[in-house]
């Protein structure tokens, strides 16, 4: 079993914001593989199912971004999974919009949701998929991540969400190294 944890903020006001790119990828996986994310468990909305024969728990923490680690830790502890069976999906300011990047480990890179997970799990050796949202040309980063994607950005984002879902599918079925080779291009 794998846990796929998409990071974001709960509530309708954050639904289409840049900071919720992780939720969007998990929703894309759910749609593509017929998994309903309706249960409340582990301080999260969850859905259990299979992706090409691999059992998964899709997890959307409802703790707000900066406390995501508490929800992810509960799920990992409950299933007694090694961290290699967790994939965290989140937005990345340092990647251009339209790019994705898979990593097996690393620092939080300033992302507070990932920082919370690293702190709660006590390790940086956590597989992750980062969704590029780019940096604002001007203005505050905090305001930028909490703003919705523009119409033009959504045109770039939609195929990126599908690409991210495909990358996770390859990681689960053919291995993370194969997925990194196939999907970590450009950016």
Curated annotation (Swiss-Prot):
This is Peptidyl-tRNA hydrolase. GO terms for biological process: protein quality control for misfolded or incompletely synthesized proteins; rescue of stalled ribosome. Monomer. It comes from Carboxydothermus hydrogenoformans (strain ATCC BAA-161 / DSM 6008 / Z-2901). Hydrolyzes ribosome-free peptidyl-tRNAs (with 1 or more amino acids incorporated), which drop off the ribosome during protein synthesis, or as a result of ribosome stalling. The record marks 9 as: Discriminates between blocked and unblocked aminoacyl-tRNA. One of its GO terms (cellular component) is cytoplasm. Its EC number is 3.1.1.29. It is found in: Cytoplasm. Its main location: cytoplasm. It is an enzyme of class 3 (hydrolase). The record marks 91 as: Stabilizes the basic form of H active site to accept a proton.
